[in-house]
Amino acid sequence: MSQSVLIVDALGAGKGWRTRSRDVIGAGPRTVASLLESDYEVSLITYEDLQKLGLDSVMDYDTVGVSIMTGDERAARRMFDHTRSRTFRFIGGPGAADPNALLKTGADAAVIGEAEETLPELLEERGPVRGVYFRRGTEVDFPGPRPISRRFTRVNPEYIRAYAHRWAARVYVEIVRGCSNSCRTTFELPDGRKCSGCGNCREGEGGERWECPEGIPPGCGFCSVPSIFGPTRSRPLNEVVREVRGLVREGIRRVVLSASDVLDYGRGDLLTDPRTPPPNVEALRRLLRRTSKHVDVLFVENVKACLLNREIAELLGEYCRGTSVSVGVETGDPRLLRAIGKPSTLKEALRAIRLLRRAGLRPHAYFVYGLPGQTMKSAKLTAKAMKRAVEMGAEKITVYRFRPIPASAFGDFPPGPSPRNDEASRLIADTARRLNEALKRRMIGKRIRVYVAEPDLRRPRDAIGWPVKGGPKVRLKGARELVGTECEVEITGVVSDKVVSGKVVRILEEIDVEALEGRGVPG
């Protein structure tokens, strides 16, 4: 009899349940479950559902793997504390790149980045292998990195059944792995590493751009994707379409084509230049045409501003009209942009927002406060850039506090100062809040389609609507009984810079959620 493996999606569950992006289902845990299903009895569950069953349920499995982000270590620890002594325990996901996560969670091993080659070997050996941090008591072994893989797992769409609100969620489907940004930060790192100005990462050719004589990780300093997943490579189109079709058969209505930059799709193999060659228009057209014909609503995740032009914007608008799309601006200070390793300029980012808006999409502009090198001058420039982004058509300004991510160039920097304690961070955060509240007020009186997805966690008699084409969550007073429907709602007010209130105008569709819930998860 084959051994049993439980994969737990604990992404964002540090407090015991997800409080943000509850309408998002990532690709990672489903990919890992699919990778192992031919050799093991695999089950997939979310951390929230596992708590409802009882954490003691993990005792039934020979191996337990948990997908985490930084901040989810406590959730993993609580699970692992309920396993038997002979159970093999591992972590994966973005949080696994920190060797300290092994000690915080009590896991035996942490899979860094891609699982295709690493995880099967790890479960066979149950010992140190390349691409894994392995714990021995309070010591951590690292046999070394594993070369990047060109292999993509064939994802079993049936694993989406592990997610209770899948019918209303935005389900991510991987189309590109890695990142093409070879640029590096020019800031001196805490351990003394500093750019020597050799020019390889910005002016070199091919693989030369990926090599840094000073050992500085590639990519934007705050991001670990290039250093963990390597240069960009595209997933075969037939595999993408196969997964999308399978998800639709499972009741999925919204799909997000997931990539560090959708415009890298089909642009080349093992791409190390974020600017050239230009996007492969025909490859993108085939991707969008063949996926959009199967699903109700198609999103693209991210676009690099330096690759976007009017032709590409109009192509995205043709197949994804009315949906939200992310543009990373990060800061309004041109000097800081280059210093953190960003390949796009501020001018390019603002132009991309304008082009996307004109093409019928709803761009969201992303900024970071507390970055290394932040000054009051850079904060003022960032506040100005936020206002310009709104003028160019940004529907939302998203701001994040800089937090060091393991395996990124800035991984050893301290977290950025909070708005409470720092005037520059406060200026950026307050500007974003005011702009977002003003943008939400523009919505009052408008009618949109939402999926009434779940009761309000704070007001159980109310319900939360997830806008069909993306946007702020809609609080619907007294609408708990409408959970499981698609409705047209009128926006009536602004609750916060992230939530609006609304009233139901009419029910468009009653969805047979019970039939979907009755389908068993593979395993």
Curated annotation (Swiss-Prot):
Any one GO molecular-function label of the UniProt entry: 4 iron, 4 sulfur cluster binding
Radical SAM core domain residues: 193-447
PANTHER family: ANAEROBIC MAGNESIUM-PROTOPORPHYRIN IX MONOMETHYL ESTER CYCLASE-RELATED, METHYLTHIOTRANSFERASE MJ0865-RELATED
Stored SUPFAM superfamilies: Radical SAM enzymes (SSF102114)
Protein name (database record): Uncharacterized protein MK0932
Keywords recorded for this protein, A-Z: 4Fe-4S, Iron, Iron-sulfur, Metal-binding, S-adenosyl-L-methionine
Spans traversing the lipid bilayer: none
Required cofactor(s): [4Fe-4S] cluster
Annotated binding of [4Fe-4S] cluster, by residue: C212, C220, C223
Taxon lineage: Archaea, Methanobacteriati, Methanobacteriota, Methanomada group, Methanopyri
Gene3D superfamilies: Cobalamin-binding domain, tm_1862 like domain
Superkingdom of source: Archaea
PROSITE patterns according to UniProt: RADICAL_SAM (PS51918)
